[in-house]
Each structure stands twice: as structure tokens, then as C-alpha cells.
Amino acid sequence: MIDLTLQRASTSAVPDSAAFRLWAEAALEKPHAEVVIRIVDREESAALNSTYRGKTGPTNVLSFPFVVPEGVPNDLLGDLVICAPVVEREAAEQGKPVEAHWAHMVVHGMLHLQGYDHIEEAEAEIMENREIAILRGLGMENPYREIRPE
């Protein structure tokens, strides 16, 4: 079960909170967790991306895992910050339904909060395979499939 707080700081249309909960729970690998998902605009995403990653411009999803001090019980996984305009643009560019891309970004971010990464090729393969399996369980296509123009 997930205790999800959804913060909407973007004027873009986004899926409802039930969808975010479904996607986050599908990716959850422990019995209970607390997660904050903040939906932001390009400006906030770009500022956070610059501050925490040293990168210019907005990005689709940022993950901020909560590091629990040793010996302290805590269900807080951390925060996800998702840029609505970037998700919408990427879905259009990749020729996929926007809701499927939202689901992918939530699943991707949730896996980061739980220690998955994609810096090394072997880690990326493990993470991507996990994402594909979770999304398949939600009835969605492989987000990494080749998109071929018709």
C-alpha cells in the first residue's frame, strides 16, 4: 500500500490521483511506503534540474530518495518531480498515448526511489526490464519499443 501525496504546481492537464496511485503501487517493492509526487511546469523542473543535476533545461522526472538514518524505522521513500509539459511533448514525439508515458514516468521514478539506476549498461537493462514488466502488468506496451513512422 502506498501513502501518496500528489501536488499539482502545473496548469497542464494531468491524470487523476487514482491513476498516479495505481502506477506508483504497481512499482512498489515493499509492503508500505510514503511518496510525494509533485507535478511542475518547465521553469520549476529546469531550476531543480540545474540545482541537483547541474543540467540545463527541464527534464521529464526527477527522483529525490529519502535517506533514512540507520536504525530509524520509516516508510518515506522520497519525492518525484514530474514536468507535465515535458511528458506531454515526449509522448507526442514518441508516438505513444500520453497516459502511457505518464505511467512510465511514475514507474521509472518509483524504481529510482527504490535504488534502481541506469548509469551503467547492466543496471539500465535490469531497470528497463523491470519497467517493461510493471507496465505490461498495467496493460501497457513496452515504452522502449522502436517507434517507426508510418
Curated annotation (Swiss-Prot):
Entry's Gene Ontology BP terms: rRNA processing
Source taxon at top rank: Bacteria
Keyword Zinc part of the UniProt annotation: yes
Gene Ontology MF: a single term: metalloendopeptidase activity
Keyword set includes Chaperone: no
One Pfam short name: YbeY
Binding site for Zn(2+): 108, 112, 118
Compartments where found: Cytoplasm
Top EC group: hydrolase
InterPro entries the record matches: MetalPrtase_cat_dom_sf_prd, YbeY, YbeY_CS
Gene3D superfamilies linked to this entry: Metalloproteases ('zincins'), catalytic domain (3.40.390.30)
Keywords: Cytoplasm, Endonuclease, Hydrolase, Metal-binding, Nuclease, Ribosome biogenesis, rRNA processing, Zinc
PROSITE patterns per UniProt: UPF0054 (PS01306)
Record note on cofactor: Binds 1 zinc ion.
Cofactor(s) for this UniProt protein: Zn(2+)
This protein's GO CC annotations: cytoplasm
Record's function text: Single strand-specific metallo-endoribonuclease involved in late-stage 70S ribosome quality control and in maturation of the 3' terminus of the 16S rRNA.
Family assignment from sequence similarity: Belongs to the endoribonuclease YbeY family.
Protein name: Endoribonuclease YbeY
Source organism (scientific name): Methylococcus capsulatus (strain ATCC 33009 / NCIMB 11132 / Bath)
